[in-house]
């Protein structure tokens, strides 16, 4: 009985230490992905994380952002397409899907930037008020946007959508200039 009690206390101390480190690290720069251009505000309220497609778009987004409250995270390539319907497949399938997704460096980078954790997900540790997916207006951008939304729709990350933290930005497809006047067009029909 004493060994059980000591083991329970050790688990509790370890959990508190993990939570303390996580809370401490939530708004500190250490441990954040190198590609992340973080914002200057150290609180979540009013901050925005722009997830952009590729390093070149990341460079443009970094130049055009308001550093005070906007962060930019460029992701390269397409993430793994894994979705599990928890109602039909059960918890075991969700766990397998999550571990499969965690094999992607881009997903690990995204989760680290969000600050919520994965298996020990806690929405209270979310570093940004708004998560804005901003991909190119072409077919590849649409596919990457769909894959990111699919990932965010999986448990436990679906809480980000349910709590109104996920947004989509629609960039223009073309810029048309005539006589020193420019307009942006979002599709080929315009």
Outline where the language-model segments fall.
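A short alpha->loop->secondary-structure connector
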Residues: 67-69, 151-157
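Charged C-terminal transducer/switch regions of large nucleotide-driven machines
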Residues: 24, 33, 165-190
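GHKL-family ATPase ATP-binding module
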Residues: 1-78, 84-90, 121-123
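Intrinsically disordered, low-complexity regulatory segments
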Residues: 32, 61-131, 161, 178, ...
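Conserved nucleotide-binding/hydrolysis micro-motifs of P-loop NTPases
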Residues: 56-58, 77-80, 138-140, 166-168, ...
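N-terminal assembly/transducer modules of large multi-domain enzymes
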Residues: 1-10, 134-143, 155
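Alpha-helical scaffold elements adjacent to nucleotide-binding pockets in ATP/GTP-utilizing enzyme cores
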Residues: 106-109, 143-151
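Acidic beta-strand-to-loop metal/phosphate-binding motif
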Residues: 51-53, 128-138
């Amino acid at each position: 009985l004493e060994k059980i009690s000591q083991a329970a206390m050790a688990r509790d101390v370890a959990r508190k230490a993990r939570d303390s480190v996580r809370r401490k690290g939530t708004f500190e720069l250490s441990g954040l992905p190198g590609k992340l251009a973080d914002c200057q505000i150290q609180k979540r309220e009013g901050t925005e994380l722009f997830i952009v497609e590729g390093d070149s778009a990341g460079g443009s987004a970094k130049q055009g952002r308001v550093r005070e409250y906007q962060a930019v995270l460029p992701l390269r390539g397409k993430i793994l397409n894994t979705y599990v319907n928890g109602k039909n497949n059960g918890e075991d399938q969700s766990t397998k899907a999550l571990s499969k997704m965690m094999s992607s460096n881009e997903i690990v980078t995204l989760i680290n930037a969000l600050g919520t954790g994965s298996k020990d997900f806690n929405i209270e540790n979310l570093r940004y008020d708004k998560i804005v997916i901003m991909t190119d207006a072409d077919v590849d951008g649409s596919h990457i946007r769909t894959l990111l939304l699919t990932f965010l729709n999986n448990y436990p990350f679906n809480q980000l959508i349910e709590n109104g933290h996920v947004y989509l930005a629609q960039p223009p497809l073309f810029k048309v200039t005539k006589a020193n006047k420019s307009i942006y067009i979002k599709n080929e029909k315009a």
